[in-house]
Amino acid sequence: MGFNIWSLLIILLIVALLFGTKKLRNIGGDLGGAIRGFKESMREGEEEEAQKRADGESSDEPEPLEHQDEPAPEQTTQARESSSARQSAEHHDRSTS
């Protein structure tokens, strides 16, 4: 059940009578302005991406972390001693079994 041209014209006439032509014109202008603004922002985003690619940057890749020259923290003497004691005890348990 498709709409023919006469059905569409009658619907358009009813809408125009309900809202008035001035209000419909304003709604159409607002909608057109929103679409233009959206297209413009999309174009600007594409231009920024192209500029980044031209500069050698890539937005898809994460930026590399800066290398820190600080050495890793060393274990404390107490932690090393307890680790050695555990290893000795395990070795002793294996040898006596």
From Swiss-Prot:
What GO molecular function annotation could you give as one example from this UniProt entry? protein transmembrane transporter activity
Subcellular locations according to the entry: Cell inner membrane
Compositionally biased region (Basic and acidic residues): 37-56, 88-97
The UniProt entry's GO biological process terms, in alphabetical order, are:
protein transport by the Tat complex
**Which keywords describe this protein according to UniProt?**
Cell inner membrane, Cell membrane, Membrane, Protein transport, Translocation, Transmembrane, Transmembrane helix, Transport
Extract the ranges annotated as region (Disordered). 28-97
Disulfide topology: none
Biased-composition ranges, Low complexity, are 78-87
What cellular-component terms does GO give this entry? TAT protein transport complex
Q: Known InterPro entries for this protein?
A: TatA/B/E, TatA/E
Q: How does it sit in the membrane?
A: Single-pass membrane protein
Report if keyword Nuclease is assigned.
no
**For this UniProt entry, which segments traverse the membrane?**
1-21
PANTHER family reported in the protein's UniProt record? SEC-INDEPENDENT PROTEIN TRANSLOCASE PROTEIN TATA
Its annotated function is as follows: Part of the twin-arginine translocation (Tat) system that transports large folded proteins containing a characteristic twin-arginine motif in their signal peptide across membranes. TatA could form the protein-conducting channel of the Tat system.
Family note: Belongs to the TatA/E family.
Summarize subunit and interaction data from the UniProt record for this chain. The Tat system comprises two distinct complexes: a TatABC complex, containing multiple copies of TatA, TatB and TatC subunits, and a separate TatA complex, containing only TatA subunits. Substrates initially bind to the TatABC complex, which probably triggers association of the separate TatA complex to form the active translocon.
Record NCBIfam families: PRK02958.1, tatAE
Question: What name does UniProt use for this protein?
Answer: Sec-independent protein translocase protein TatA
Q: What is the lineage of its organism?
A: Bacteria, Pseudomonadati, Pseudomonadota, Gammaproteobacteria, Chromatiales
